[in-house]
Amino acid sequence: MSGRPGSALEGLPFGRTAQVARFEELMFGTVRLEELAEQARRETRKNFGKTMRLFAPLYLSNECVNTCQYCGFSKDNPIRRVTLQPAEVEAEARHLAGTGFRSVLLVSGEHPREVPVAYMAECVRRTVPLFPSVAIEVAPLEVDEYRQVVEAGAEGLVLYQESYDRAAYAEMHVSGPKRNFDERLLGPERGYAAGFRRIGVGVLIGLADWRKELVALAGHISHLMKVCWRAQVTLALPRLRPAAGGFQPRVAMSDRDFVRAVCAFRVAFPQVGIVLSTREPAKLRNGLMELGVTMMSAGSETEPGGYTGVGKARLHRTVRGREVALEAGEWERAEATEQFEISDDRSAKELSGALRQRGLDPVWKDWDRALTA
């Protein structure tokens, strides 16, 4: 690992706090990884006990109006697309609930016509009876739009900045509303104003210098902990995975540096939740179970209809945003295109077993709406 990053916070609306300085020292200083890992283990046990919250993503649509170089859903990719109907979303949700999940993340590409706010709210209403905890990961919205989703029953908002490097962000987001860096950056605060009780932010490793990205993420977290002080703040640092379009990471982050980053965030931000998705391999996820991670996904499908096959009859292909019918018979053997390839394909049951082997308790439900009714 090379030295400390330069001006990672330049041009961002938050500064270098004591917590950010602490993170930098842990991440780029002289402390040995083994020592840092032990500190992270102690802080995790102290603040979160022996628990691991489990959740599953549920994709609503892979339609998108943005052209993003790295994303499988990018408008320019000629992929198979579909937007699930609310009843189909409910069918996917019932399947996940039947496997034990009580926390779900509703995910969608950005397409105002195919995925309007009213549709999102209806999908939330369909899933709320099955899941005590419903979160959304969709395009940035305005406060009144977020409020509609909160009133429908959603309690969590996930909005990753992708990259905090303005130049890299502009290069990666070629066209579409996602090009607006600041609109996205301020989205979590608008979500908080609308009433979300859990706010998740993150950076996609592979788009720019990951050292600067991590410091900027630390700055964002420190800022949100002050301005969104009633909410639980969570973070994630997913690494790029293969996806339609074939984009290759601009910079790689080793497993050792990834582990160090998780541990450094845990020690510098002891009460912040850390999310680890199925992008990472099973062996690495196993190793991080006790070192700072507090939320894990399992058995994930990253395409709409991936759990039950619903919506298959309406599959179509798009070429630069224009809809093209599938070839005769193609839909019978095809599925919607996934956003990215997962690495850890273990089921929820298998992941629960791995957690218990390490003395950890899988938590399917950790909140109920009656607590705030």
List each model region and its residues.
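Conserved, mostly hydrophobic/aromatic
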Residues: 40, 68, 106, 159, ...
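Canonical Radical SAM [4Fe-4S] cluster-binding loop centered on the CxxxCxxC motif
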Residues: 42, 46-88
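Generic structural signal for well-ordered alpha-helices
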Residues: 56, 93, 120-124, 146, ...
